[in-house]
């Protein structure tokens, strides 16, 4: 059992989350310059410029389980890095809104596929004692990527004059190259090797790094016992409860409004009265708080469990979202608004942000884990795309005052709290093969 190797493999694969976070938020700095450059309508800007990457994530998450099972988790992760590299360079040299949208779509496919491959891989090379915090490293890297993207946008503002947005987008190619190189050095998932390649010997060598020597034979037997089910349909009726859990946690994740805030943070803060430079710097503070409270979540998830963090996060969501709506409706000071936005971000980071990828990667058995991860993440990205596409239009209808939108998100988080209290099971301290649910 080699804890250092397990951590190194996990943090390497979790770097896909860094590219995910960077790619997701880097567009916030380019949003307004692109709108002015190509003079796009609110609907076109929302559906194509801001949401095209999200439509790519829908495709990547829907079909990400196919390469995960066919060519393996590791090889899928390598191709994900290549997609990020192509998207970064292509977006930077885009010559019109259509070419820009195409390359953003390519990056979105990489993001969507990474939300399937990375948590699946990490859950399969970790043990029950550390699985929560190791899978949550993916989320840590997402928020670290978000923070670096905000900071990068702030530093590059004015760097290239009217084309500074091209530098903001193109710089992502550098970490993409390093990610590809690092992933080449991690082993294949032992569970994938047994189930899809029948290579028990190679899997055994990897399992020795994960479990004590005395448990290896037992683990191999448990994994093999699910081999005859690897072609099972996820919709066979055997996994209805897991499907419902994955759908609801992903649905509520996006109905918190998190992507709306992250994508439109500078615009939201400017509409509340902050100057452009101040709003970008405030976005950096959002990224920092996100990172800090994700670190708290990493420390707590295997100690107190997934449900506990979701309860704390839900309560924080409700208080902060209703307060943000109040700030907009009654035109309160923009710095008061920023405080409640930071509380919202902290609530997300310690709750949904830390838990979602861990929980979905745990609840499905070996035979359909990648497919289940794909279903949960596809739900996440479909709603992310829909919300991001329609919010520019809705804000325009509300005379650029999004207060009622935040009231709506607050109501949805009341429903999430009910889901956590009444339906969500605890998965802390249970091995993947021992995870049982009543459908």
Language-model regions: role of each:
Residues 202-206:
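Solenoid-repeat scaffolds in large eukaryotic assemblies
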Residues 1-199, 225-439:
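Alpha-helical transmembrane bundle of multi-pass membrane proteins
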Residues 213, 217, 275:
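Conserved H-loop
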Residues 216-225:
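Short, well-structured alpha-helical segments
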